Amino acid sequence: MGAVGVEAGVFDTVDGLVGEVMRLHRSLPARPAVEEVEAAEALAAAADREERARADAVARLRRSPAVPDELLCVAQEMHRALAGFQCREQKRDAARLLELEALHTLFDDLIQRASQCLPSTSTRAAPRIAAPAAATTTTSTAAAGSSSSSAVGNAERHASSGTNGFTASRVAGTSTSTGRVSMDDSYVRKAKAAMWDGGAAATNSHLPRGPVEANSVAVRADGNYGDDNEKLSLIKLASMIEVSAKKGARDLNLQGKLMAQIEWLPDSIGKLTGLVTLDISENRLLALPDAIGKLFSLAKLDIHANRISQLPESIGDLRSLIYLNMRGNQLSSLPSSIGRLLNLEELDVGSNGLSSLPDSIGSLTRLKKLIVETNDLDELPYTIGHCVSLVELQAGYNHLKALPEAVGKLEPLEILSVRYNNLRSLPTTMASLTKLKEVDVSFNELESIPENFCFATSLIKLNVGNNFADLQYLPRSIGNLEMLEELDMSNNQIRVLPDSFGNLKHLRVLRAEENPLQVPPRDIALKGAQAVVQYMSDASKRTTKSEPMKPKKTWVHFCFFSRPNKRKHDRIDNAT
């Protein structure tokens, strides 16, 4: 009775054993590509570092006097156990791939040993068989653990010394420049034919296939990976990074393409030094690696809609960066190194948990668009006045109590939104913002709008609505805003519009509901913007005409009534 899975009589002849070697080698899964092996090794090392970092962080936790020691120990032990489990989960695919590579390397070594057992005389009669060009591939094998490293060394030593049929066919047909073999077994058949067909090499229809790349990661020219709906595992992500690095990829789009279990990027991301655009948005990443700072060519980085709570200081090394979108993460602060992004033109950190902005943000002198809305900001740094190229500032949905006077230095500013804050006033320096086109200060606590605000004569849209009981009147000089097209003053306590309102000839949208308006009457306000403008214009003209002419004073008046003694004036008035 033969061994399980082995035909009877296989071990009785050399022919049978050679066939068994062929079968066993053929039964292996496809050998991983070199890039996949390198990626797996990097992933395993990174996962170990991550586990150690989490364990160290847990060990540094200190209890308060009210917490029992044992309770803290239990919590720490649970944290360590979970970190270990997550590490093993992240390494699972990488470990399997490395085991497969080690098995292939071991089989290489065993085949070399088997080749030494065959009669050396047979190979002298066997001609060298050239491999098809398409099957020969130059690779550089990475070691897969200590066992695989020794196996590779043994295989290479045997390859250099062997002269039999196994070796001759392998060297001529399917070996690579470093001794790595594919799962092709045609060399076994060729050796067999040379030994048992009277010394003549038989023709073999099974051509060498070269290194099998069935599991290799394909990266399209546009930087997208495979099927748009396919989610990448950590090992596939790492493999794709390796391939992209070797191809010199310029664009990489991973938007929403990472499996939910992936919480960090492998350090190998730093190899993509030629990358210009990187989109890793809409995933579940918790952090960016320090290696992100090595992407010196990166001009656009989009990481919005992840769970990143902290940025590495190396983010400041992205000196070519023009666009940075970090919206919708869990950032509580920004590193001061962000001030080194001197070419940055657009920065979006909206919908995070920022309580302050670093003063270094003032170094971003080329910044044109800054979005910090929906955070926990109490103030904007005074250095924002140094962002002299700023065109758009979105700072709504925060806790701002005032705007810095330095805002007045932002002369190119066209769009300003500070809605849903706690502003009670606007800085008078805003009079310098002569290029303003849109201003939204709704849902604040404004008590008034400064008169010199109306020097911003290029204004097209103004929203001062929903300041409720605080805002009771508009500036008298609002008529200077002759380019104004939209005005929202709803939900305030405004009773009378200023006379100059009639100068707003371009006004086409007016929202004035929920105000105790008396001038103009409510029925006029309901007719729309131009009806109100016309009414106020007519009212202003009527007021001007109805003012009585003051009599001109003659020299008699100056003589008799210009003395400063009030009693004398009273006596003269009574006498007349």
Swiss-Prot record:
- Which InterPro entries does this UniProt record tie to the protein? Leu-rich_rpt (IPR001611), Leu-rich_rpt_typical-subtyp (IPR003591), LRR_dom_sf (IPR032675), LRR_domain-containing (IPR050216), LRR_R13L4/SHOC2-like (IPR055414)
Q: Which Gene Ontology BP annotations are present? A: intracellular signal transduction; response to light stimulus
- The UniProt transmembrane annotation reads none
Leader sequence segment: none
Q: Which SUPFAM superfamilies match?
A: L domain-like
The UniProt record describes its induction as: By light.
The motif GVYW: which residues? Answer: 528-535
Stretches forming LRR repeats: 272-295, 296-318, 320-341, 342-364, 366-387, 389-410, 411-433, 434-456, 458-481, 482-503, 505-527
Family to which this protein belongs? Belongs to the SHOC2 family.
Functional summary from the UniProt entry: Leucine-rich repeat protein that likely mediates protein interactions, possibly in the context of signal transduction.
The protein's name in its UniProt record: Plant intracellular Ras-group-related LRR protein 4
